[in-house]
Amino acid sequence: MRKNTYAMRYVAGQPAERILPLGSFASIGQALPAGEPLSSEERIRILVWNIFKQQRAEWLSVLKNYGKDAHLVLLQEAQTTPELVQFATANYLAADQVPAFVLPQHPSGVMTLSAAHPVYCCPLREREPILRLAKSALVTVYPLPDTRLLMVVNVHAVNFSLGVDVYSKQLLPIGDQIAHHSGPVIMAGDFNAWSRPRMNALYRFAREMSLRQVRFTDDQRRRAFGRPLDFVFYRGLNVNEASVLVTRASDHNPLLVEFSPGKPEQ
């Protein structure tokens, strides 16, 4: 882990807290503290969105209309402006961000808003070899009502690289976390899978981790070179609903998925 890899936690009424990597889930997964369930319902609603550093109008109205009822909001390119932090802390018990790089005023990176405090938090970063800008990922774990633990992986994959070596390298520590977790998993975000080799690497990783891809009937996901960039993968859950919200509030469209934590599909 790089020494400058950390997460910042935002909670209402408390100062921002720096969270350092705890190490592999393999070493501490059996000793996690008890926590409140992410949801008291028989469903888990998530919103996944590259928010484009909040550079366009209406981003806040989209979050207010579609994010406030979600149990999890997985943002990429989230810039910790006062407006976003205020929304996050007013509507969620915890908001964890992994700063990928610091813009003139506010850090930008993946950010996970959750209706419960995570019992595990592991920030990850990978530097793009060409632009030398970092992309971040965040692994968090939440209790479910059925006593299982849900692992959530929020990913913004490296974009500019020659070949797929760095792309695959970024997935390795994520795979280490998932491989040592026996419960359900949601892995989602902007995977920048704009080439056939990248797509193959991502699908191969998903197969190795026994992850399924959420399918969208009216697939309005952002595309590059004809390939979707945003994905939701899962394991140990059922998909109830999945849709893509078409909006001009970012250069990506938000993904809305509802899961049920009951008996997984066969």
Swiss-Prot record:
GO terms for cellular component: cytoplasm. HAMAP family: UPF0294 (MF_01119). InterPro entries: Endo/exonu/phosph_ase_sf (IPR036691), Endo/exonuclease/phosphatase (IPR005135), UPF0294 (IPR022958). Gene3D superfamilies: Endonuclease/exonuclease/phosphatase. This is UPF0294 protein YafD. Keywords: Cytoplasm. It comes from Salmonella typhi. One of its GO terms (molecular function) is catalytic activity. Belongs to the UPF0294 family. It is found in: Cytoplasm. It comes from the Bacteria.
